[in-house]
Structures are given as structure tokens and as C-alpha cells.
């Protein structure tokens, strides 16, 4: 066997095939590829020696210690344990998610860090802030702008969103990419119109080519097919495929019969918009001006509302009159009595309004005053004047006898009759009738308030003074003490004067044993 490879010496390391072929033992003729091999001899050299051979280490058996010393590439996030039940784990995850904003992976990682101790994990959740994985509207807008500038270079996108990690950016990109295929109706319509224009241009070009190739068409022949159909039929296969693609491209729009919400289409508007691009721009400018004017109106209305709101916050306290913090008192002073009579003259039996006018009297106290001082201040005539102003005609009182016979009696007359019956004393009690009082003063006109009778001054000491007539205790039968004089009685002789046909106000009643003074001037 001829020696092709010799043992290398210290100075020689490479043996070429050309030297082996020129050896005296190789008597084979040269093949046709010898010339090509000689040209590329540097590519076919055999490299022998330690410089060109790999050093193979000794075989070591596999052992667990071999992998224990290696650095772990990942981090263990969660490892289940039997000491934590599923219900307790779900409760812990829900609390971490709702209260601290952790997701499931972060909450389980915290629990694993504390060796499945739920209490320690819950206490330590507030000490860390989880990475936000939620995308706000601002983040989405920034991502779209950054993607428009930099494309899929997420390192540059992260420079515009420094609080987002690259995995989060990639994850949001694929979810955002799915929504890009959803185009609006207006965009689809624009694409359709653009496709139609391109198709018309191409048809015109093909029609011109067909006319040049075929010569002038015969316009008098009605059986000749139109020229645009021939280039379409004569187009090769790829052209027909393109037509089919454009035909079925907008197939989903066939099912949509109505425009989207808020868009109203009319033939006039479409004709005006599609007529010329300048007209469409003018229409948009007009709409923009209307929008700007509406925004100005909204801004002015907001300013007006804010000023009114500030005025309402002040309240009506500055407009209220100053009110003194008076306490309710059951005693009636002379000024309060006169004020009550004037209030009755103006408000009638509206005791609530009268109590508000006086200020320190309740509704019950005003009613008691009306019943108690009806005779003293001639409140019936005051009410008649008030009713005359309300109705426009005076109402004369009805006698008690007619009321007993069945005639309609006003409420004031019935109340007066009841008061006389309640305050009357049994006839078995002896009493002395004093002489008749002096004639009453002439009646006053209805336009002026009635004269006010001043109560007589007490002659006895304050402790021995008798109570005024017509108090609330009149509804009970008075018990006469053995050494106490009888109470003052109302003279019943006035009942006969009611039968007289003389119209006009009646004189005030007199009290037995009371000294009358000349009336005070009218208010």
C-alpha cells in the first residue's frame, strides 16, 4: 500500500496531495480534475498536529453535585404546599389583588418568599409596590405614537414608556395588533372609491390599447360589444384573480344596511361631497366653524354656571334680617297685645303667621290669646273687617236665637255663643246688678281698625288680683270658695240688641264690675 501520509517531523507539518501523486510508487495517469485540484490545493490540505487537533477530556460520570453548583437561570415563583388550603389561598389572593393591586403571580411569589406563611405575607404586602400591568389611555396613545415612529424597535418604545417592561410592551403589541384590522366604514368607503378610480384608469388605458390594435371601431354596428368588456375578458389569469379579490373584499358590507350610530347620509350631501374635493373641504370648514362656536357657547355657559354656583355657595344668610334669640314667653305685654290685634286685622285667623310676627309666642299661645281677649279687644269686629276685605262685602253676625231655629250661623257667632254659655254662671248664685253703663261711642268705619280697650288698672295688690276673664280654665266649672267673690260675668243684655235691623259693627261687650274709660284713639 503506498504511503500517502508520512510521519511529520519537527520542521514539516503539512503534506500535499500533489507530492503524494508525484511519488514513484504512484504510476496512475492524471485524471481530468488534476488541474482543478492543483489550482485549489490550499483548500485540500490535510492539517496534522497538535495545533490542529482537539483535546478531548476524560469522561466523567453524571452526578447530582454537578448540577447543584450551576447558577439557576430562572426564579421559582410558586411551589404548592399542603399546609395552605385552597380556600385560604383563594382568600389570600383575593385580598392581595383587591387591597394592594397584586396579580396572582406576584401574590404567590410573596407567599413563597415567606415560606407559605399567610399572615406574614399579608403583613408584608403593603411594603412593596407591584409593577403596573394596566394600560391607561395615555399609555396607549404614547405606544401608538412610538410605534409609528420606531416600528417594532421595543427598546426605543420603552424610552417613551419607561415604566413598562419590554415583555409587557410585546404582550400589548400583539393584543393591539388584532384591533388594527378593524377599519371604520369611512376608511373602507375611501378605499373602495380609490379602487374604483384606479380600475377606471386601468380600463381607460386598456381601452386605448385595444383601439390602437384593432383600429377604429364601427359605431354603427349595434351588435358590437362594448370595448371595456374585451380587455377584461382578454386579461390573463392573475388579472381575473385580482378582480375576484376586489369583488369579495367588501363582502361584509352587504349585510350592513344602515350607517353607524350618529351618521346620517343623504343623496344631496353625498353628491355635494363627492362632486369636487374643494366643496368637501368647504363643508368641513363650515362644520369646524360651527363646532368652534358651539364650544364657545359651552365655555360661556360653564363660566355662568360656575359664577352662579359660587353665588349659591354663599347661601341666603347675608340676605336674612337679623333675628334675636328670644325665648318663648307665655306672658303678654301691652305692646305684644297691640301687635297681635294688628296681626289679626291683617292675617285673620292665620295663627301661624301671627306667631311669626310676634316672635316669642307659639301657635297654641296665639290661639289662647284669640279666645281669651276676644271680648276685651273686640276681635270679632276685627275679623269682620278682614273678611270684608277678603270677600268685598261685610258679613253681619247672626243672632243666637236664629241659629237655634236652624238658620245658618257663621263660625264666629257660634264660637261667641259657646263662649257665653261656658263662661256663664248658674242662676242659683246670687249677684247684684250694677247700674247700666254709659252709652257706647259711635261705630267706626270699616276702613279703620277698631278702638282698643285698655284694661283697668288693678287697685288691689298683685298677689290678691283676680285672674282676667276668659282664661283657659273657663272650660271647667268654677268652684266657688266660701270666702271668694263670684267671677265677673258678661252682661247678657247685649243679646237683645242683635235682633235690631240696624247694620254696622256692634259695641264691645262690658264686664260687670269693670270701670270703663274713654276709648283710646284708633290705630
Curated annotation (Swiss-Prot):
This protein's record includes keyword Phosphoprotein: yes
InterPro entries registered for this protein in UniProt: ELM2_dom, Homeodomain-like_sf, REST_helical, SANT/Myb, SANT_dom, Trans_reg/Corepressor
Record-linked Pfam families: ELM2, Myb_DNA-binding, REST_helical
Biased composition (Low complexity): 460-482
MF term (GO), any: transcription corepressor activity
Residue numbers of Asymmetric dimethylarginine PTMs: 479
Covalent cross-link (Glycyl lysine isopeptide (Lys-Gly) (interchain with G-Cter in SUMO2)), residues: 88
Disulfide links within the chain: none
Compositional bias (Basic residues): 248-260
Biased composition (Basic and acidic residues): 30-43
Annotated spans, Disordered: 1-43, 185-265, 387-523
UniProt-listed SMART domains: ELM2, SANT
GO biological process terms on file: negative regulation of DNA-templated transcription; regulation of transcription by RNA polymerase II
Coiled-coil blocks: 283-314
Domain SANT: 130-181, 327-378
Record-level GO cellular component terms: chromatin; histone deacetylase complex; nucleus; transcription regulator complex
Compartments, record wording: Nucleus
Biased composition (Pro residues): 432-459
Biological function: May act as a component of a corepressor complex that represses transcription.
Name of the molecule in the record: REST corepressor 2
Encoding gene per record: Rcor2
